């Protein structure tokens, strides 16, 4: 018994600790990448494209990574939107909230393995993204610098 415990402690435990530490640290690293609102906006644009590609190619497993990468970028834009005019901040904040909610629905549909529900949820993501694009966050945040 002690020999098996020693084998577990020396062979498997360090690997489990490393996996656990990396799984905790990855979202923090993504969040640190997107402190700049213009970089966050670029991340949102790219991840929406990645989600569209994943759903259209019926690769629902491909939804997970972009849906995790987009969240810190959404939070960054929400945080920076308070520096915009009240009306602009409200419109961008509303669009970001809808985008976040739509991404959650898409992630859930993909986790369920439902192509039909994923396509429906993707339309919601695209609608929220179009609403955000209409507010031209690139120009709004560019003027802040």
Q: Which positions does each model-derived feature cover?
A:
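P-loop/Walker A NTP-binding region and its immediately flanking N-terminal helices
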Residues: 21
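Mature extracytoplasmic or organellar-lumen-exposed domains after removal of signal/transit peptides
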Residues: 32-145
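N-terminal amphipathic/basic-hydrophobic helices that include classical n-h-c signal peptides
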Residues: 1-3, 28, 144
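Bacterial N-terminal signal peptides that target proteins for export
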Residues: 2-17
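Sec/Tat signal peptide C-region and signal peptidase I cleavage site
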Residues: 25-31
């Amino acid at each position: 018994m002690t020999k098996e415990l020693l084998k577990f402690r020396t062979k498997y435990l360090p690997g489990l600790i490393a996996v656990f530490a990396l799984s905790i640290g990855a979202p923090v690293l993504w969040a640190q990448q997107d402190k700049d609102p213009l970089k966050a906006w670029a991340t949102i644009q790219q991840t929406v494209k990645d989600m569209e590609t994943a759903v259209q190619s019926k690769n629902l497993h491909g939804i997970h990574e972009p849906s995790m990468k987009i969240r810190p970028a959404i939070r960054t834009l929400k945080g920076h939107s308070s520096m915009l005019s009240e009306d602009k901040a409200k419109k961008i904040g509303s669009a970001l909230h809808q985008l976040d909610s739509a991404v959650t629905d898409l992630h859930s549909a993909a986790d369920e393995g439902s192509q039909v529900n994923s396509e429906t949820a993707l339309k919601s993501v695209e609608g929220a993204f179009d609403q955000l694009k209409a507010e031209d966050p690139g120009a709004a945040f560019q003027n802040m610098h």
